[in-house]
């Protein structure tokens, strides 16, 4: 039976990256729920298209057992993460990442996802594909120059342009 996925979308989110996951999951019968990493469910894509997520990240806390995997969909909100790290939704993001990792769930993402996984303290010894600009900031995991990397329960792609390179492995793992 296919697994259920919690998809985290920052505000703004890269629509190209987000919709690669959502469409692949839909086409393969994989259930998902989109959570806005924001104060409200209303978010935008980097290009300004308005979206309404299923819920906000605060409401995912305590429901980690309802899901088998987590996707972090990166976007233009991430380069300013440090300036907003103390916002409740970003504090919740770190909590959710730690909770999913602590339960051994699949952690999937692109661009700076590996960096945020690293910030959460959950990447010790893991190889990660991260955006070249984020690579120097990775301290616990091992940032690579690869387009995508699968290492244990971590599935990371360097950018939205390379999500497709790991999608066959992601879909296979989610269909087990």
Map each language-model feature to its residues.
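A cross-family phosphate/adenosyl-ligand binding-site feature
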Residues: 45-46, 50-53
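Active-site-adjacent pocket-lining segments in enzyme domains
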Residues: 3-19, 23-36, 40, 53-176
